[in-house]
């Protein structure tokens, strides 16, 4: 047995704003959005992030999600092919309305920056030579 795809499920307060943000970054929707869900494909490795309305997400969790304004849930790392590409992603994220919580910086042999989406979910772009 093996898994074929991994999905992450997060809450969104505004599906249309989520669509605008991730579309502006160049990610493709995974199917058509509904009134409770929009889904995006990340990278070429079958990683999907579903963004559910807060009410639907709470139902799925059987509990309360974290408050992303004051708490952290996870940081998704997205790979880049070069330091220059990191800088291009930085400008794209800013233009799309993302909030930079960690300015570009060297990390060991790599180069990275961190941002939040409109709902406060944290991501970073990372260049790591040989990765």
What would you call each of these model-derived segments?
Residues 68-71:
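Short, basic/glycine-rich phosphate-binding loops at helix/coil junctions
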Residues 40, 48, 87-131:
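Vicinal oxygen chelate
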Residues 35-37, 73, 110:
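Short hydrophobic/aromatic beta-strand or adjacent loop that forms the aromatic wall/cage
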Residues 9-58:
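Core segments of cupin and vicinal oxygen chelate
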Residues 60-66:
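Short beta-strand/turn micro-motifs at beta-sheet edges
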């Amino acid at each position: 047995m093996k898994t074929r795809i991994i999905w992450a499920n997060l809450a969104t307060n505004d599906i249309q704003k989520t669509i605008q943000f991730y579309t502006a970054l160049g990610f493709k929707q995974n199917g058509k959005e509904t009134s409770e869900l929009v889904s995006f494909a990340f990278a070429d490795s079958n990683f999907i992030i579903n963004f559910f309305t807060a009410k639907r997400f709470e139902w799925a969790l059987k509990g309360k999600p974290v408050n992303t304004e004051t708490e952290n849930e996870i940081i998704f790392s997205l790979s880049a092919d070069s330091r220059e590409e990191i800088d291009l992603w930085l400008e794209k994220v800013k233009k799309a309305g993302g909030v930079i919580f960690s300015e570009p910086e060297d990390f060991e042999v790599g180069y990275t920056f961190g941002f939040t989406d409109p709902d406060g979910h944290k991501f970073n772009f990372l260049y790591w030579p040989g990765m």
